[in-house]
Amino acid sequence: MAAYLTNRVLMSSLMFFVMTGSLNAQVADIKAICGKAKNQSFCTSYMKSNPKTSGADLQTLANITFGSAQTSASEGFRKIQSLVKTATNPTMKKAYTSCVQHYKSAISSLNDAKQSLASGDGKGLNIKVSAAMEGPSTCEQDMADFKVDPSAVKNSGDFQNICGIVLVISNMM
């Protein structure tokens, strides 16, 4: 009889913890997230293009979009770094070199943001991703100031849009 009661209590406790954990991991409302994004059509396309986002909870979506932001920043950095190496025009080389520094700063800010993401600190994530967004944005401005073809930093727009999604998600965490 005691073994039966112990078994029932154990099973009830186990069910309680399983159900409580399930409640915390609710499917994120992608429509609501994209409705708050700066570029709603980009957000919707981005979410639909990645099968991992379907049925994901908020933390998982944050991880997915944050990973995309890191990839985008790294790709932009590599592209501009290669332009520095091949530029023969001193003005262009100066603009590209400036952009390399801005992208390094963005990547550094994203690396700092990883801790906030891992701990579920939405506010910290928001602050650090916002800081990361400044680098490529300043790079675009530098390109305009130096009168260099801004298509060299086309990647910056995607980076900004992806980070914008991360910001929306961070505000919901």
Curated annotation (Swiss-Prot):
Expression sites by tissue: Highest expression in flowers. Expressed exclusively at the pollen tube tip.
Disulphide linkage map: 34-43, 99-139
CDD domains, alphabetized: PMEI
One Pfam family hit: PMEI
Any one GO molecular function term: pectinesterase inhibitor activity
Main location group: secreted
Glycosylated residue positions: 39, 63
Coiled coil ranges: none
BP-aspect Gene Ontology terms: pollen tube growth
Keyword Secreted attributed: yes
Residues of the signal peptide: 1-25
One cellular component term from this protein's GO annotations in UniProt: endomembrane system
tRNA processing found in the keyword field: no
InterPro entries assigned: Invertase/methylesterase_inhib, PCW_Enzyme_Inhibitor, Pectinesterase_inhib_dom, PMEI_plant
Cell compartments where the protein resides: Secreted, Extracellular space, Apoplast
Keywords attached to this entry: Apoplast, Disulfide bond, Glycoprotein, Secreted, Signal
Subunit description: Interacts with PPME1.
Similarity annotation: Belongs to the PMEI family.
Remarks, miscellaneous: The polarized accumulation at the pollen tube apex depends at least in part on local endocytosis at the flanks of the tip.
Main function: Inhibits pectin methylesterase (PME) from flowers, siliques and pollen tube.
Identification of the protein by name: Pectinesterase inhibitor 2
Annotated source species: Arabidopsis thaliana
Gene that encodes the chain: PMEI2
